[in-house]
Curated annotation (Swiss-Prot):
Notes concerning its domains: The N-terminal region contains the highly conserved SGGXDS motif, predicted to be a P-loop motif involved in ATP binding.
Binding site for ATP: 30-35
Function text: Ligates lysine onto the cytidine present at position 34 of the AUA codon-specific tRNA(Ile) that contains the anticodon CAU, in an ATP-dependent manner. Cytidine is converted to lysidine, thus changing the amino acid specificity of the tRNA from methionine to isoleucine.
Superkingdom of origin: Bacteria
Biological process annotations from GO: tRNA modification
Reactions catalysed: cytidine(34) in tRNA(Ile2) + L-lysine + ATP = lysidine(34) in tRNA(Ile2) + AMP + diphosphate + H(+)
Protein name, entry field: tRNA(Ile)-lysidine synthase
Organism of provenance: Chlamydia trachomatis serovar L2 (strain ATCC VR-902B / DSM 19102 / 434/Bu)
Length: 321
């Protein structure tokens, strides 16, 4: 058994020092290198947790792998939950990757509520983070939304905990190999039918070969800059959102001419105003709103199921009657 892992890692120390060790948690245990590493890490930090494994039955070996994980957890005196959803062939659905993720998260949420777990540990690492950031770049995400996954974030009212986001995959594998720990090699992670697998198997190696340098660390640096930008934007936005009022037509966001001199901030203020009402505005929609504000022209726009009225010096989300 691995007794201590990354004892001098300051980021891990900071993460676990902020954790309430009197509470109990879930660990999403796939059996791969990442989740097994995290399992031993949690044991070494005296975290009380239950491992949960979802066997989709996609591989011929998955039944035996689930049994092996159950035996390992029994050996390590770790409570273990096995879930087997109705078998689905991963080649039968175009959205199976996201569907499987949604199923897992709903399962984690239900278990946390039923058994009073305080959060779920997930084994995402630095390479996963880099993939997420590059994917968001290609999707055209806002500069303030390139921060990637957070070490702690709420899924509804359940905490998702990712302490490994700064640790590269190769260090995780090296640590397990040095202790002769066996882990599952999930072939579906290499199935290029899935976007993540294509990025991992083809895109990242290609970019690193052409660029001639590691691209993971610059992407992680970009995520750090994005997180700082997001924090700054939120600070700058707060005073404007405090001016939102209810009037006879709905929610009114007053817009002063001075704000319009900074289009980046003006559009972010509008974006957050819409988000606070549960509305996600695209870049093109925000640009349209900004253009009308700049010209002082009046416009009635549709955003999902709501009407947005733009006029000189203000934006109104009309009430639903």
């Amino acid at each position: 058994m691995i007794t201590r892992l990354f004892e001098n890692d300051k980021q891990l120390e900071g993460f676990f020092s902020s954790l309430d060790k009197k509470k109990k948690y879930l660990l999403a245990l796939s059996g791969g290198s990442d989740s097994l590493f995290l399992m031993y890490l949690l044991k070494s930090r005296a975290i009380f947790f239950t491992a949960v494994h979802v066997d989709y039955g996609w591989r011929e070996t998955s039944y035996q792998e689930a049994s092996d994980l159950a035996a390992l957890c029994e050996q390590e005196q770790i409570p273990f939950i096995l879930d087997r959803p109705e078998a689905t062939d991963p080649m039968d659905s175009r959205d199976i990757e996201n569907a499987a993720r949604r199923y897992r998260y709903e399962l984690f949420y239900r278990l946390c509520k039923e058994k009073c777990f305080s959060g779920v540990f997930l084994g995402h690492h630095a390479d996963d983070q880099a993939e997420t950031i590059l994917k968001r770049v290609f999707e055209g995400a806002h500069l303030g939304n390139l921060k990637g996954m957070s070490a702690q974030v709420m899924y509804r009212d359940v905490a998702l905990l990712r302490p490994l986001l700064h640790i590269p995959k190769h260090k995780i594998v090296e640590a397990l190999d040095s202790h002769q720990v066996q882990y599952v090699q999930d072939i579906t992670n290499c199935n290029e039918r899935f976007l993540r697998a294509r990025m991992r198997e083809r895109l990242f190696p290609y970019l690193q070969d052409v660029f001639g340098k590691n691209i993971r660390d610059p992407l992680l640096s970009l995520a750090g800059d994005s997180a700082e930008l997001r924090e700054y934007l939120d600070q700058q936005t707060a005073p404007f959102l405090l001016r939102v009022v209810d009037n006879e037509r709905g929610k009114l966001l007053p817009i002063e001419q001075e704000l319009l001199k900074t289009p980046f901030l003006a559009k972010w203020v509008c974006k957050q105003f819409f988000l606070n009402e549960g509305l996600v505005a695209s870049k093109s929609f925000l640009q349209t709103v900004y253009d009308h504000l700049m010209t002082g022209s009046t416009a009635r726009l549709r955003l999902r199921n709501r009407t947005v009225l733009v006029k000189a010096r203000g934006v109104i989300i009309e009430s639903i009657y």
